[in-house]
């Protein structure tokens, strides 16, 4: 019976490798962020359970990598040696090496000595152990395979595992023997053996079948996607069924996976367990921390195959690729306009809803986009972060700087299709095109007079209101138009920017120069514009 107990405990010892899942680099690259996060959670949870049960005394390399947010495929699968790992299942195609034979003999002796300390009978134990050893050798080629019953489940056992872990908690003090004095009674051995099998059964439910067994693939009946684990298939099928069994008790939102619910609940609790060691910024998800770390490292692992542009996140790459494909999968149900990314359609939909969630805390004005609020706040702060390198003039918006720089470059990218006249700004082109169309959309509500642009209407309305917002700082005289003030100020400065090319005579106003030039071309003189005289 001592031999039976020894073999049962030796064979049923659960190792970290028994519940670990390995990925190659190619397989890891195929997983999305949520799948990688689920894998990380399961592996870390399995490790914590084995530690709490006393089944692992050293930290495996894959756990160290996962805790650092690194990819687990960096770990090469090796046969772990020592009490932490115990024996690995050896495939039928692998031969036992002399080193493995020595390890088997060493472990046999170690267990015999342990049984001796518990005063168990083992008069012929060594011979029986050698004769019956727990490796079954094939004649001729010395190949071996671990005699272990492979247990599989058709249904995932995630919800039931916790209770089973507790039921085997009495074994946590020693990975080989119970802490209580072992009494060689058949019923006690049977009870402990059953508990250990139950615990291992639950762990086996979340790992692939042993490498000794033929790998059985499970296919989804809806999309024919293939899985190696029944639990993965069960999770996947919820995509088709729409089943979301995990519900948040705070807001009622439901999820198809427990890990997604745990992540969501951190919104309510404010928990952010993942902290950046560089800047101390904290995150609710490990995947978000991994993405953030690339800000410090500058790593951009996702590269566009078309233009070779690189990105720090796969989502950014996917969004960028739509520039090349022209794909616009997000369509507005109100007007049918399509967008290449989700954030753009969310912003666009506020046009229809009138939603303006971003409010200025100084004047209370609200905006549909955060960027609009940021630009607006510079009115209050006076901030002008965009400076022209040519003349030093600063602007509150980058677009205004871009428009201004065309003064220096002379660039006029907006061309009229009717007369081929070009403009530096699209607004100027739109205003010009009304010359050809005759459109005058801006009408004065006082007199009904219409104008082709809003600035002309604004200036005209001052005729009715008598408003003169432009005041000379020298003499205090006020004007309705900014241009009129500029002309007036030349009286004080003596500036005469308009010069006749024939006689070199200068003038304060362009209209006066035009009137003067008629002397040289022989045109009849006419009195200056009365408006200009009034300005002077």
Swiss-Prot record:
Keyword Iron: no
Gene Ontology annotations of biological process type: regulation of transcription by RNA polymerase II
Signal peptide: none
Molecular function GO terms recorded: DNA-binding transcription factor activity, RNA polymerase II-specific; RNA polymerase II cis-regulatory region sequence-specific DNA binding; zinc ion binding
Keyword Transcription regulation in annotation: yes
Zinc finger (C2H2-type): 218-240, 246-268, 274-296, 302-324, 330-352, 358-380, 386-408, 414-436, 442-464, 470-492, 498-520
Pfam family, one: KRAB
Disulphide connectivity of cysteines: none
Protein name per its UniProtKB record: Zinc finger protein 570
Organism name: Homo sapiens
Gene: ZNF570
